[in-house]
Amino acid sequence: MADSPMPDSPIPAPRSALPPLRVLLAGPRGFCAGVDRAIRIVEEALRRHGAPVYVRHEIVHNRTVVEALERQGAVFVEEVAEVPEGAPVVFSAHGVPKSVPAEAVARGISWLDATCPLVSKVHREAERHSAAGRHILMIGHAGHPEVIGTMGQLAPGAMTLVQTAEEARTVMPDSANGLAFITQTTLSVDDTAEVVAILRSRFPDIRGPKSEDICYATTNRQAAVKAIAAESDLVIVIGSANSSNSQRLREVAERAGTRAVLLPTAVALEWSLLSGVTRLGISAGASAPELLVDQLLERLREHYALDVSERRVVEEDVVFKLPAPLA
């Protein structure tokens, strides 16, 4: 009797033979209401107008999301000048300077605004402070699209960017007519609180929002990461490297005393990272779909017997409506 053919790949070990791994899922994690709305705007524009629909900048900072929309017919560009005349264009969730829709109007291009309503709220705050004659200190990261968009709501010189606590200690704005501060929505809650405290100490009459402009989703996800970090040997944050809120989650875990890494996808996981890890925390940035978390768990199950539980610090029920042209 002929020998049986050798299998193409090793037979997976039975589950009982796999080493145990406890997984703590941070909750909430993943998509926020602003990201969900932005994606729905692009999808609805494609449904109504057909492909292609142009999108200025990545609609949200996640390549998985961008590539999925590209397969549906979205075309991503960096400037309105790249959009053919007559084609619709969507502005990303991060917001844009006022010069961008003005350029679209000048070229006769129809546009849809997918700016997160919480970012738009910051824009309106800036306009109110400027109308009252106040110079504005914007707490945020230089070069981030949200900061560029927010500072672009007013004339050059109307705002001064403050990125760190050290800059807050040394900034010398013209405060003859009063000062105000606003913040990027995706910052570290703790870092921003420190910067605001310094500014209030130096400028007691500075005006600001009743609470910092950091959005509910950013705040909730950072609190959830803090909750799992203390119980984890390693925290994996699913998110893109250019995602501010995802990077902040990694930093929050590290400041809690836990090793942390940022992964764009499950495929990017290097098994050496898990050497000596028996308790693994997992979260995902506000622009990362839950599908990526599911794929990471599937990959982990190939090597470990998982015990998965969730640490949910708050329930979220925020939903943002589509803009009027698509409602």
Predicted regions span which residues?
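The feature marks the mature, well-folded catalytic cores of soluble enzymes
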Residues: A2-D3, P7-A286, E290-A327
